[in-house]
UniProtKB/Swiss-Prot annotation:
Post-translational modification, as annotated: Fatty acylated. Heavily palmitoylated in the cysteine string motif. N- and O-glycosylated in synapsomal membranes.
Record CDD domains: RGS_RGS20
Subunit structure: Forms a complex with G(alpha)z/i2 subunits and mu-opioid receptors; the formation of this complex results in mu-opioid receptor desensitization. Interacts with OPRM1.
Organism name: Bos taurus (Bovine)
Tissue: Retinal-specific. Expressed throughout the retina, including photoreceptors.
Residue ranges, annotated region (Disordered): 1-21, 135-158
Pfam families named in the record: RGS
Sequence ranges of Basic residues compositional bias: 12-21
Membrane topology annotation: Lipid-anchor
Descriptive protein name: Regulator of G-protein signaling 20
Coiled coil spans: none
SUPFAM superfamilies: Regulator of G-protein signaling, RGS
Domain of life: Eukaryota
Job of this protein: Inhibits signal transduction by increasing the GTPase activity of G protein alpha subunits thereby driving them into their inactive GDP-bound form. Binds selectively to G(z)-alpha and G(alpha)-i2 subunits, accelerates their GTPase activity and regulates their signaling activities. The G(z)-alpha activity is inhibited by the phosphorylation and palmitoylation of the G-protein. Negatively regulates mu-opioid receptor-mediated activation of the G-proteins.
């Protein structure tokens, strides 16, 4: 590194040998008082960390900077102090509208000595009295007064309304279920358990309903069979004849004795009208007079085809439509399709049960005993 010249070295030493000319700015006396005031203000505002031993810079701008900082800090301190003191905001409460309940409340429900309270207090009081519960008097407002024989006029609400709807039904069933000395009380006592439908319990009301339907069906059948024609007049069957019925259904239907025995069995199954309809169709085929054919066809239609008849037979819609179109000009064969359908029904459904019935077996036993005695 090249060395400095002698002139430069002398100038350098002369420059550094001069006394320092920097001006030492001392803080004025009023800044110390301001420092004390700032410390007291921060402590009074409740700040957790007070500023102790604040040192001012030795500059003319230090007081201005300090005043700005102290003002800002004191403002923040006041702001956070207010936030800590303020309670958290609450969610807005939803007000109920009890205006519909107020007209239903009688003035007598209010306790004596209480006057009408205006405004919100009156609304709350009326709403509380309208709710179901026990009032301070110790008696429900809708309870029947035993001494006066009168009940309150407050309308029932909620589940109480459902209970009141059930009471008339239960009251109507109690005389038949609980009256002593009547026949069938043992069976009906358990039938009053409930009268409302419930999907999770099995109630004996269904059993009572089925028994009632069977009783009505039996009564209706007995009423409609009062005007039925009597059985065909025929001699009693022989053992060989009765045994031939088991060979085929046609052999059973060919003999009057077989038809009478089969008709008696159908009567026990409440389906005697099938045999009567088949026999009426056979009688219609024997007629030759047009007026007689029309009259008998009309009678057969009203007795066995019409949906209003208690002796209606079971036919499909196609056969019914064919008969309805042909009733304008009926003929002897107007019911052939319906007769064949009923014949097939008796053959497939009733005939096998007749062969296994006690009626047919008893008939064979009695005929066998007569044959042995002879």
């Amino acid at each position: 590194m090249p060395r400095l010249s002698q002139d430069n070295q002398q100038g350098h030493q002369k420059h550094f040998s001069r006394p320092s000319r920097r001006i030492q700015f001392l803080p004025p006396p009023w800044t110390e008082a301001y420092n004390v005031n700032v410390h007291q203000t921060v402590e009074n505002e409740g700040c957790a960390t007070a500023m102790h031993n604040v040192k001012l810079l030795g500059s003319p701008a230090a007081p201005t900077l300090l005043s700005l900082l102290s003002g800002t800090l004191s403002g923040f301190a006041r702001f956070f102090a207010l936030l800590l003191r303020r309670p958290p905001p609450e969610a807005p409460l939803r007000r109920r509208d009890f205006s519909a309940l107020i007209p239903a409340l009688p003035a007598a429900v209010l306790s004596p000595g209480h006057e009408e309270r205006p405004g919100r207090l009156s609304l709350l009081l009326r709403a509380a009295l309208a709710l179901p519960g026990r009032p301070p008097g110790g008696r429900l407002p809708r309870e029947v007064d035993a001494s006066a024989g009168q009940s309150s006029s407050i309308p029932p609400m909620g589940s109480e309304w459902m209970e009141m709807r059930k009471r008339p039904v239960c009251a109507a069933q109690e005389p038949t279920a609980c009256a002593p000395g009547q026949p069938g009380v043992e069976n009906q006592g358990s039938n009053a358990c409930c009268f409302c439908w419930c999907c999770c319990c099995s109630c004996s009301c269904l059993t009572v309903r089925n028994q009632e339907e069977q009783r009505l069906r039996r009564t209706s059948y007995e009423a409609r069979t009062e005007d039925l024609p009597t059985c065909e007049e025929s001699p009693g069957p022989t053992l060989e004849e009765a045994s031939a019925w088991a060979q085929s259904f046609d052999k059973l239907m060919l003999t009057p004795a077989g038809r009478n025995a089969f008709r008696e069995f159908l009567r026990t199954e409440f389906s005697e009208e099938n045999m009567l309809f088949w026999m009426a169709c056979e009688e219609l085929k024997k007629e030759a007079n047009k007026a007689t054919i029309e009259e008998k066809a009309r009678i057969i239609y009203e007795d066995y085809i019409s949906i209003l008849s208690p002796k209606e037979v079971s036919l499909d819609s196609r056969v019914r439509e064919t008969i309805n179109r042909s009733m304008a000009e009926p003929s002897r064969n107007i019911f052939d399709d319906a007769q064949l359908q009923i014949y097939t029904l008796m053959h497939r459904d009733s005939y096998p049960r007749f062969m296994n019935s006690a009626l047919y077996k008893d008939l064979l036993r009695s005929l066998s005993e007569k044959a042995v005695e002879a």
